[in-house]
């Protein structure tokens, strides 16, 4: 595989992640994150599609009569919001379960891109590092949950929740997904969570661009099953090109 560590747009890093995930050097490290994502996200999407129409009809039914003309606009918007929410929630759960293997995937991608070893201790070191890695995932959840709860409450407000809420939720999801996946290469170098967020904010355009494309892919059936390893590969490419030299 031809290595290219040039700087890209946020979209570009995600698309490069597809190329990296399919490369011979990386493929075997993709398997476990991929399986975790298929089992959890696949099951969630199957359940979602069997209930989606009922939920949306009930939600739109809360609109005041004078806003009933918005139904045709809100139906697809609410469908995308629910899809993104479900996919994000179960992707987060899959990421939590597969966190040690996600970190290993990010490590191998970085080694492929830079030609330099990050850790020489092997798989035993990965197992020993599990408690610290899970603590980091918990730290991410503590950052995300208050904001997610606030936005969820906004969605329950008639009219406002059905119009402004989905847009704000999509923006929020894009940022959270950027944090979720970019954190793996940062964490491999033991960079504190708050420092990682600060560095991403310095390149917010690229972080949001990356998160938006990840968010879109999580709403597309079948494609959402491969998002996790692809996003990790793309986020690691972003780390190498944009942030590694800042350490």
From Swiss-Prot:
GO molecular function ontology, one term from the record: high-affinity sulfate:proton symporter activity
Predominant location: membrane
Matching Pfam families: EI24
Disulfide bonds, paired cysteine numbers: none
Membrane-crossing segments per the record: 29-49, 66-86, 141-160, 164-186, 212-232
UniProt subcellular location: Cell inner membrane
GO cellular component: plasma membrane
Keyword tags: Amino-acid biosynthesis, Cell inner membrane, Cell membrane, Cysteine biosynthesis, Membrane, Sulfate transport, Transmembrane, Transmembrane helix, Transport
An example Gene Ontology biological process: cysteine biosynthetic process
Bilayer disposition of the protein: Multi-pass membrane protein
Domain of life: Bacteria
Family designation: Belongs to the CysZ family.
Purpose: High affinity, high specificity proton-dependent sulfate transporter, which mediates sulfate uptake. Provides the sulfur source for the cysteine synthesis pathway.
HAMAP family tied to this protein: CysZ
Official protein name in the record: Sulfate transporter CysZ
Species the sequence originates in: Vibrio parahaemolyticus serotype O3:K6 (strain RIMD 2210633)
Gene, per the UniProt record: cysZ
């Amino acid at each position: 595989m031809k290595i290219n560590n040039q700087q890209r747009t946020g979209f570009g890093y995600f698309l490069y992640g597809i190329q990296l995930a399919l490369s011979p050097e990386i493929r075997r490290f993709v398997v476990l994150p991929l399986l975790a994502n298929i089992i959890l996200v696949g099951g969630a999407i199957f359940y979602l599609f069997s209930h989606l129409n009922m939920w949306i009809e009930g939600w739109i039914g809360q609109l005041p009569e004078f806003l009933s003309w918005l139904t045709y606009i809100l139906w697809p918007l609410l469908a995308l919001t629910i899809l993104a929410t479900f996919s994000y929630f179960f992707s987060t759960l899959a990421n939590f379960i597969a966190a040690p293997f996600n970190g290993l995937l990010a490590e191998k991608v970085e080694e492929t891109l830079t030609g330099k070893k990050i850790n020489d201790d092997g798989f035993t070191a990965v197992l020993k590092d599990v408690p610290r890695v899970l603590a980091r995932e918990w730290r991410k959840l503590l950052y995300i949950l208050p904001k997610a709860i606030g936005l969820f409450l906004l969605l329950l407000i008639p009219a406002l929740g059905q119009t402004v809420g989905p847009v704000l939720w999509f923006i929020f999801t894009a940022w959270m997904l950027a944090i979720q996946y970019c954190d793996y290469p940062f964490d491999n170098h033991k960079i504190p969570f708050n420092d990682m967020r600060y560095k991403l904010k310095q390149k917010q355009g690229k972080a949001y661009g990356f998160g938006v494309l990840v968010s879109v892919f999580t709403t597309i059936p079948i494609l959402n099953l491969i998002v996790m390893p692809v996003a990790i590969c793309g986020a690691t490419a972003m780390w190498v090109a944009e942030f590694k030299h800042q350490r």
